[in-house]
Amino acid sequence: MSSPTSRVVAGREITFPVPVVSASVSGAAFLIRAAVVRRLIAAGRQSAVLDAAGAEPVALPGGRTPAIMIHVRYHDVPGNVLGAYHEMGLAFQLKVPGHGTLVHIHELPVDQDFTLAAGNELWGFPKWKGDMVGTAGGALDDARLGAVGSAGAGGVDLRLDTRVGVPIPGSQSLAMNCVQVLDGQPVRVTAEANARGGRMRPLSGARVTIAPGADDGNADVARFAEAVRELGLDRARALATFSYDTFEAEFQAPERIG
């Protein structure tokens, strides 16, 4: 099946590839229990489609799956087609027969309406709306996620500290390959990125905290907090924490799997 060249979102025609011309990003990688990843995916709305595609959590020795938590701030500049916004992501590595190891984005809250619609309708990214604060990029990012109207309070806090890390020199070419569900079908989503102004802190630098009140009221925030708790991310030591002051990317049209 051929990939689309464009799609209309909220009355606007969006042409692929979709550019990100200016953003900053901070994140951390973890090893988490594959059995918990499997259980979280099975409880989600996309589980039947992912099962039919044969997707399974990557299981390293000890039954562990690589995971990432990330905070991205998209800047208010011309050329950022989806606008200026924050997003916080939780993603896992899955094996998909015939496609190797792909990343599955499990949660992707954002703080603006248009990117929420675009992420879901263009690529099947599981975006929902919350309030977020934080810098992203730089050597210290105190990212906070809460319900709409909370100014980031009462949800999940993600502190990413690379101040004692090592600089990553020059420009880094990065690639993203995801498996998501779009219009009831499994799709592969790819992006090519370039990042500069990086720092890396091995074996530490991240602290994930579930704030008081995270389980009360907002169902999306409560679900995110429960996933953090079940995965043990609020107790885990990061494999590495990273930040990039400058991040540019192009997101390609989704490709049907199978």
Where are these regions (language model features)?
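Generic alpha-helical propensity signal that fires on short helical segments
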Residues: A48, V110-Q112, P126-W128
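N-terminal domain-onset segments
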Residues: M1-Y85, V221-F224, L231, R237, ...
